[in-house]
Amino acid sequence: YAARCVRVAQARQHRQRLGRSGECSVRPVIMNKAFVREPDADGRVLCPRCGSLGISVGTGPLDTHIQESVRSRLPDSAWYCRHADCEVAYFNMFEQCVMVSELRAPVYPYDLDAPICACFGLTWNDVDADSRDEAPLRIRELLRKSKSPEAMCQRLAIDGQCCIREVQQLYMKLSKAP
């Protein structure tokens, strides 16, 4: 618990240094690895804005979702912030960020009207409808399609991961709602 509090406090300090463009007010110059902030001892990397745990992503999602004008900010890999209320979509070890407003199109979870599934277009409303139906036919169809070669999650999904877990969690949450 204490380590988490320290990381949250550090994230708050870093947040204060971030400008609206998502880059630190003190711009890093080309540095060698000695000056790169190392991940926490357990390998986790936290969002510099909100302190949420980052998800490592490769070039596929970055190329797909980041506007060309800012794509060079995160050339090889980055971390994705899944916190829906955070303004940061992607960030790197230098705390350079790509903001949600700098993405090519609206994406879930930042925009609930955007598809949860980037490959097949399943939306929050589809999951909500399935939670009220006798059988979750849309979700079953998505599960079937997600195992097919048509699924391109590593490139199309905002986090580079299959959405099935997110869809199942949302379904369970909505099923319990009155």
Mark where each language-model region is:
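N-terminal amphipathic/basic-hydrophobic helices that include classical n-h-c signal peptides
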Residues: 1-30
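Short, flexible, mixed-charge glycine/proline-rich loop motifs
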Residues: 34-42, 70-75, 108-111
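Short recognition patches in nucleic-acid-associated and regulatory proteins
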Residues: 46, 51-73
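Short cysteine-rich clusters marking metal-coordination/redox-active sites
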Residues: 47-50, 81-83, 117
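Short functional micro-motifs and their immediate structural scaffolds
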Residues: 55-56, 86-91, 122-124, 158
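Short cysteine/histidine-rich metal-coordination sites, predominantly Zn2+-binding motifs
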Residues: 61-71, 96-109, 132-137, 170-175
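Short metal-binding segments enriched for Cys and/or His
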Residues: 75-99
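Long, compositionally biased
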Residues: 147-178
